[in-house]
Swiss-Prot record:
MF GO annotations: oxidoreductase activity, acting on NAD(P)H, quinone or similar compound as acceptor; quinone binding
Protein name: NAD(P)H-quinone oxidoreductase subunit 4L, chloroplastic
Protein encoded by which gene: ndhE
Catalytic reactions on record: a plastoquinone + NADH + (n+1) H(+)(in) = a plastoquinol + NAD(+) + n H(+)(out); a plastoquinone + NADPH + (n+1) H(+)(in) = a plastoquinol + NADP(+) + n H(+)(out)
UniProt keyword annotation of Membrane present: yes
Main location: plastid
Organism: Carica papaya
Amino acid sequence: MLLEHVLVLSAYLFSIGIYGLITSRNMVRALMCLELILNAVNMNFVTFSDFFDKRQLKGDIFSIFVIAIAAAEAAIGSAIVSSIYRNRKSTRINQSTLLNK
């Protein structure tokens, strides 16, 4: 697969994630869009690591680190969303006024 194809796919994923994050009114959807953005970045890390220097695995290792951070972020984000849902009975971002009290 060519470098340009992977970069275009990564740009599409990143754009979809940014668009979804900006227009999302649901917290779960916002978390999913954030995961799309992180996966697009991981694709770039692995692609550039493979394309420019095949012997060193810096991009691959950093990508694994980002995946671990994304998994922790998803777990903590899901816990926060479920806690907000239990208290407010809604996961809509514009209805959540936790910081105004």
